[in-house]
Regions:
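ATP-dependent phospho-/nucleotidyl transfer catalytic cores
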Residues: 77, 84-88, 150-151, 163-271, ...
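Conserved N-lobe beta3->alphaC-helix segment of eukaryotic protein kinase catalytic domains
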Residues: 143-158, 189-191
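Conserved beta3 strand of the Hanks-type protein kinase catalytic N-lobe
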Residues: 129-130, 141, 275
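N-terminal accessory/targeting segments that precede structured cores
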Residues: 1-125, 131-132, 154-175
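Hydrophobic residue at the +6 position relative to the catalytic HRD Asp in the kinase catalytic loop
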Residues: 278-282
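Activation of the activation-loop gatekeeper triad in protein kinase-fold domains
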Residues: 292-296
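Glycine-rich ATP phosphate-binding loop
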Residues: 134-142
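Long, amphipathic alpha-helical stalk/connector segments used for oligomerization, subunit docking
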Residues: 316-322
Length: 322
């Protein structure tokens, strides 16, 4: 318990100066005087400070930044842009050394000398390795991460009421909904056995669609801490030059992505729930690759029916139906 309170104070002190600045901007209290205009340059500087702070505070806060980078309904565009760097610029030292997990789980079946680091995430690190003559990818959970995440989730839960003081009414609604789901989502994301199972299921669902690539898994190498999968290279989905090089218009790729996610949600009932640019790429032959299934979710038949009804109402412009 003492460790929790120390951590809470540490986090509070890190965010306190920026919190006061935001309150001052909006004149949330009389002692701050009239509200003031804040330039884009100042907002960018603050966004960079917040990004650096989340990196310093560790995996749970990095994950908060990653989620916020996909929520323009909560944070302004300048912050979305800066937080987006957390999608693929997380240093290996952001958590414990993942190599200890690789050595414990796979030393007998993988030649460790063939391991090459590829990318760092808030909860895991990705390597490539040689296995049975193939190049595979290993998503490895950071050691000790579960205890760290559980502690910091308590801290984040305690900070939400303070965060609401900085938000306007529209943002408050979005923040409360996000806070309610965030804890469940991140704890599920730590279960790599669940991820590899859902990944294989989604792969089966697209077996007849050669436009979509879901990397094949290696069940014998997967565990609660490791997801072993086919290594699939791709170009960033946001790189218009890369799309042009393979003969794809951005609108064409956007349509494919939309149709893919509609199929997952409305037809299959199991879907990849983290479609930020760091998790989507395009192959040299123009296929869409989807990575990282930790945030995948399921929809019940009733939920699918409700979403389908909503889309029909929107298409018909039926205001009363909404």
């Amino acid at each position: 318990m003492r460790g929790y309170y120390l951590r809470y104070v540490q986090v509070l002190l890190r965010f306190f100066p920026l919190a006061i600045a935001f309150l001052r901007d909006r004149r949330r209290f009389l002692l701050f005087g009239p509200s003031r205009h804040v330039s884009t340059a100042v907002h960018r500087d603050r966004a960079q400070q917040l990004t650096e702070t989340m990196l310093d505070l560790g995996p749970a806060f990095i994950k908060v930044g990653q989620v916020l980078s996909t929520r323009p309904d909560i944070v302004p565009p300048t912050y979305v842009e800066e937080f987006a760097t957390l999608q693929d610029e997380v240093p290996e030292e952001a958590g414990g050394d993942p190599m200890t997990v690789v050595e414990a789980e796979l030393e007998d079946v993988i030649d460790l000398e063939t391991l090459e680091p590829v990318a760092g995430g808030s909860l895991a690190f990705v390597y490539t390795a040689a296995y049975e003559g193939e190049r595979i990818a290993l998503k490895v959970r950071r050691p000790g991460i579960v205890a760290v995440i559980e502690r910091d989730l308590r801290v984040i839960r305690g900070l939400v009421p303070l965060l609401l003081l900085l938000a306007d009414e529209r943002q408050r609604y979005s923040i409360e909904n996000l806070a309610g789901d965030f804890e469940d989502i991140i704890l599920e994301e730590l279960d790599f056995a669940r991820e590899s199972s859902i990944m294989a299921e989604i792969d089966d669902n697209f077996a007849d669609d050669d436009r979509i690539v879901v990397p094949d898994t290696y069940p014998d190498l997967c565990s609660e801490r490791v997801v072993a999968m086919e290594y699939v290279e791709g170009r960033k989905i946001t790189d218009e030059r890369a799309l042009a090089a393979v003969g794809i218009e951005p609108t064409e790729m956007a349509t494919l992505i939309a149709r893919t996610y509609l199929k997952m949600g409305l037809i299959d009932g199991v879907f990849h729930a983290d479609p930020h640019p760091g998790n989507l790429s395009v192959t040299d032959d123009g296929r869409l690759v989807i990575y990282d299934y930790g945030m995948s979710q399921r929809l019940t038949a009733d939920e699918q029916a409700d979403i389908t009804a909503l889309y029909r109402t929107l298409v018909r412009r039926d205001v009363d139906g909404l």
